[in-house]
């Protein structure tokens, strides 16, 4: 009898303990929802985001004395404004990259800025790629700054995917100033991404084209990719934030988490269509470095835009014609 009574008392205690735990749990949940409701009643407050240093604006002033070494000659070669040249110089001087990649060379204006800024960086080297085989590609480096040639390798006549495995990985910094029309820089970024160090610095020129006269020519690619890449952004000082025309992104770690987003960015309406041999090179290249879902997105995007570009030809296709002299001829007439 005593044993039964003792057992009953223990059961009552256990029941009470369980009941107390459940009551506390319900109270905690109710309090949580009350707090959540009042915090979000009038919309979420993002004002605290100003304390998060996601954007740095000072690279154009960083060790600008290095840029002064070439300032007098660079105007003959570069299509960038002086503050943009200083910004590119500042990026190299601050981060001291050893392995740098450049996509889009023309006469070599940005190549000269990079090469000049990296001269005292031990074991540094610049690898530059341009689709064109025009004789003026890189001509300013060769003719005006030949003493920079020992730190420079130039690849021409094909898409970046053709050269990346030869150039190799562990790239610290990239500067892209290539097509501007979609897919342009979006496609370029996807090609180079597997070869970058985890927190590499990736720069783009003409990221302000969305509100300049270039808007009329749909030169949106650098603007799109610069803004969707996950990482800390660096922009020039002094400019209106909407018109800043050059910028760098210091990549977040684990970029593989975001590659599907980057491939989706290719899904817009392309303003030009690469030739079929280039498409095949890029497709086979992607198969080595990206998953099946990415490849499917690429194939579907190519299929759609092949037809779109046929029906909506863009007049300014000269940028992508590697056998044409029209870009340089057009520049000369200005």
Range-by-range predicted roles:
Residues 4-7:
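Intrinsic-disorder-associated, low-complexity terminal segments enriched in Asp/Asn/His/Tyr and depleted
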Residues 13-28:
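N-terminal Sec-pathway targeting helices
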Residues 74-79, 85-334:
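S-adenosylmethionine/decaboxylated-SAM
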Residues 9, 13-16, 56, 283:
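Residue-level detector of alpha-helical secondary structure
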Residues 23-27, 34-86:
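Mobile, glycine- and charge-enriched loop segments
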Residues 1, 29-32:
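Terminal export signals
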